[in-house]
Curated annotation (Swiss-Prot):
Its main location: membrane. The lineage of its organism: Bacteria, Pseudomonadati, Pseudomonadota, Alphaproteobacteria, Maricaulales. The keyword Transmembrane helix does not apply. It comes from Maricaulis maris (strain MCS10) (Caulobacter maris). The complex is composed of two ATP-binding proteins (PstB), two transmembrane proteins (PstC and PstA) and a solute-binding protein (PstS). The gene is pstB. Belongs to the ABC transporter superfamily. Phosphate importer (TC 3.A.1.7) family. The keyword Chaperone does not apply. It is found in: Cell inner membrane. This is Phosphate import ATP-binding protein PstB. GO terms for cellular component: plasma membrane.
Length: 263
């Protein structure tokens, strides 16, 4: 239980603030009083065994739990000081500013161009075709994909390799100017070479975005993140600079997890 916030990031601007966040599904509590401050322009990793609550908390950040029957979310959750669970907040607009990248690449059954252009079209971010072209190119460049696909933008996104598809999905998220990018096991379906490219991309993107990644790979958390939060049985057990979590954990449960005593 973390009813006082864990904040090892006092020297960094805070992007996401959670206070006593709870989640239950059909009356069964899945997350217990999570309080945390997550900094901007950095990568924060959520680690822990299966069913520990890390993905449940991640889904709170763009209100994906709203889509689950029987889900009840409590507590306060703000992005840049704005309470995202306020009933006046349109979840569709929220999900544009809080992008989501899932475990399995999920490009739309559209062309590469239309995959990236989809969000800007819906949200009216481009008034002309040249403006839309620029948004698409910029997003693909930021995702490290432009040089690989610039000559075949009309080809299906589903025809790309797994790693390219995942970068296309990241470009799709970037195209609508998000504040936060959520990644739920983004490399679990990829081979080691594609995983390394995604990890390089994450490191590049953190210069401009708040990135939060759920991963079962402690090695990946150590490689890509600046801060790490360890969840266990629906509780946020420990949160701190990644190096401290892995080399000098304060809680014995964290120590036991990272040394492989359970998982």
């Amino acid at each position: 239980m973390t009813d006082t916030p864990q904040n090892p990031t006092a020297d960094l601007p805070i992007k996401v603030t959670a206070r006593n966040v709870t989640v239950s599904y059909s009356g069964k509590q899945a997350l217990h009083d999570v309080s945390i401050d997550i900094p901007d322009r950095s990568v924060t990793a959520f680690i822990g065994p299966s069913g520990c609550g890390k993905s449940t908390f991640l889904r709170c950040l763009n209100r994906m739990n709203d889509t689950i029957d029987g889900a009840v979310v409590g507590g306060s959750l703000t992005i840049d000081g704005q309470e995202i669970n306020d009933k006046t907040i349109d979840p569709v607009v929220l999900r544009a500013s809080v992008g989501m990248v899932f475990q399995k690449p999920n490009p739309f059954p559209k062309s590469i161009y239309d995959n990236v252009a989809y969000g800007p079209r819906i949200h009216g971010l481009a008034l002309t075709r040249p403006e839309l072209d620029e948004i698409v190119e910029n997003a693909l460049r930021k995702a490290g994909l432009w040089n690989e696909v610039s000559d075949r933008l009309n080809h299906p996104g589903t025809g790309l390799s797994g790693g390219q598809q995942q970068r296309l999905v990241i470009a799709r998220a970037i195209a609508v100017n998000p504040e936060v990018i959520l990644m739920d096991e983004p490399c679990s379906a990829l081979d080691p070479i594609a995983t390394a490219r995604i990890e390089e991309l994450i490191d590049e993107l953190r210069e401009n975005y708040c990135i939060i990644i759920v991963t079962h790979s402690m090695q990946q958390a150590a490689r890509v993140s600046q801060h790490t939060a360890f969840f266990h049985m629906g509780n946020l057990v420990e949160y701190g600079p990644t190096e401290d979590i892995f080399t000098n954990p304060r809680d014995t449960r964290t120590q036991d997890y990272i040394t492989g005593r359970f998982g």
